């Protein structure tokens, strides 16, 4: 796994429409694969839940971002050669840690399009993307693949703002402040967390401020977009699911017994 190691959106309103929506983890079509269109073979209408490892495979470039209305957009990405070999319409790809469904494939074999629903635009940093900007990507894991990071679902819980970056000779320390402070209870020192789809190890946690830090090694900075992030930038955060279950179970147990 990667070693331990643009503005924030703490509001619960939709970033492009100003409409309030209830917060929930984002899953942009990874459960149901319906009405796929464009070039290429189609998958069955329902496919198993996608799984990712948190090991970012590389960077893709935004070729276009179309706002089809105030609650729906289409994102087209350009990928390195052969990245999309064997991919089908309906396949799942993690883009900055957000599970998206391929809805179109380019004739050149290096581009794919994804539809972004209102919840994705509100809850992630994808709605702020500009043409030419780079994003992290990971194709869904297959049976037999090594889980070198930790299990990542692609369901983004919130965004976080970069509030501090400290470079040393061989490492970079990055401090994040989560947009939803209630989630900081699930962020534990030495625990896993997904940051823009990267499986990282948490360093220190400041629960009062809703902050945590990670340390990034040179390879992580080279392969992912985290190497280009600066103070004020935003990232997508996915809490590690087992940690969330354990914390919630303990809290419920103690509450039932009046502890």
What are these model-predicted stretches?
Residues 37-259:
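Conserved loop->alpha-helix
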